[in-house]
Amino acid sequence: AGMGIGLMFFAVAEPLTHYIAAPLGDPETVEAAEQAMVLTFFHWGIHAWAVYAIVGLSLAYFAFRHNLPLTIRSALYPLIGDRIYGPIGHAVDVVAILGTLFGVATSLGYGVNQINAGLNTLFDVPISPVVQVVLIGLITALATTSVLAGLDAGIKRLSEWNLFLAIALMLFVFIAGPTLFLIGAYVQNIGDYIDQLAVLTFNVDAYGDGVWVNDWTLFYWGWWISWSPFVGMFIARISRGRTIREFIFGVLFGPTLFTFLWMTIYGNSALLQAVNGMADPILQLVRDGDTPLVLFAFLDTLPFSAITSVLAIILVIRPYGLFGTHEIERV
C-alpha cells in the first residue's frame, strides 16, 4: 500500500519538484531535469528495499530455520532468548504496530488527497476536508472488510488485477509518450544513479542548512522504516524455500528496477514536456503546492485522459483493500 500509493503520488510530482527547485545547480535546465531523476531514484531505489530486505530476511531466517513465530519479536531471539514470549516481546510487537500505523497514516493522507484531486478533475468534486474525511471513512471501511475477509482467493485476484492495471497504465504512458526517449533515459538514469549513489548516501548537508535533506531524504527513510515490519513480514512469508542469495537478489534488484522503470516513464515524460516549454500549467501546480493534481494534469496531456484518470484513482484506492489481511494479524 505504501509503495503503490507513493508511486502514484510522486511519479510525476517529485521529478518536477526537483526540476523547479533544484538542490544543486540552476533550476529549470536540462541539467536540473537529469539531476531530478537521480534524486528521485535515490529516494525510491535500493535503500528502501534494503530496509525491507533486512527485516524480511531476519524474520524469514528465525521463522523457517528455527521455528519461531513470524513476528518482529523473533528477530531479537539471539539477544533475549525465550523472553521474546514475555512482556519484552509483546512490547516489541506493539512498537512495530505503532510504527506501521505512522506509515499507514502517511500513505492514507497522500492517497486521500490524490483521490479527491482525481474526483475533482473528472467530476468537479470540491477539494475540501469534508470530502477527504468521507473518503477516509470509506477507505477505512474497505480496509477493515479486507482484514476481516482474510487472504482468500478474492483478495488474491484483486491483487493480481491491481498489478495488471498498474502495468497497463504504465505501458500506455510509455507508448503514448516519447517512447524512444524513455528507453534512453532509463539507461542513463540508472548510470547516473550508480555514479552518484555513494555521494548522495553520505550527504547530510553538513555545510548547508539541511532543509532539503530533512524535507526529502530523511522523510523517505522514516517512511520506509515505518513500513518495514509489514513489508518485511510479507516478503518473509512469500520467500520460504529460497536461498539467502536468491532472497537478496529478488528483494533488492527486481523491485528496484521496476520502480526505476515506473519513475522513468512518468517522470521523464513530464520532464521532457517541461524542458520543451510544454508543461507550464503542470509546473504551476507544483509551484502552488497542488501536488495531488499533478498526476491528473499530466495524464490530461495524453490521449484518453478521462479513462486513464479513472484507472489512476482505482490504483490509489485498491491498495487499501489489499492492505493488512494476514500480515497485520501477525505483526
Model-assigned labels for residue ranges:
Residues A96-R242, F249, G254-T308:
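Membrane-embedded translocation segments of transport machinery
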Residues M8-F10, P15, A60, F64, ...:
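Hydrophobic alpha-helical segments of integral membrane proteins
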Residues A11, I248-F249:
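Membrane-interfacial loop-to-transmembrane alpha-helix junctions, especially the N-terminal start
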Residues I84-Y85, L165-M170, R330-V331:
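Short amphipathic alpha-helical segments with coiled-coil-like heptad repeat character
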Residues A1-T121, F174-G177, F181-A185:
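Transmembrane-helix bundle segments that line or gate the permeation/cavity pathway
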Residues A312-V331:
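Cytosolic-side transmembrane-helix boundaries in multi-pass membrane proteins
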Residues H47-T71, T145-L151, I225-I244, V310-I314:
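Transmembrane alpha-helical segments in integral membrane proteins
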Residues M3-H18, A143, T259-I265, Q284, ...:
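Alpha-helical transmembrane segments and, especially, the helix-loop junctions at the ends
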